[in-house]
């Protein structure tokens, strides 16, 4: 996996995690109830699943491609 692809995927998963955490925080702090989403615990459960899946993907990328990327930083993509 090349460096740019690795960084792009990493940013995607990190953004997904941040987005989900923000939504959970908003539910918690503002007591927001959206008419289409009355099942708050169900919605938070879905967001937690999204976080867990994204964290798993980041862990797998770092396990299998992280060390390779640290060694291969000689080239630049224009």
PLM features: residue spans?
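Extended, charge-rich alpha-helical interface modules
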Residues: 1-78
């Amino acid at each position: 996996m090349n460096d740019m692809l690795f960084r792009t995927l990493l940013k995607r998963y990190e953004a997904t995690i941040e987005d989900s955490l923000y939504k959970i925080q908003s539910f918690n702090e503002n007591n927001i109830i959206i008419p289409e989403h009355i099942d708050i615990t169900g919605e938070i459960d879905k967001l937690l699943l999204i976080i867990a899946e994204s964290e798993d993907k980041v862990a797998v990328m770092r396990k299998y491609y992280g060390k390779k990327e640290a060694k291969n930083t000689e080239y630049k993509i224009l």
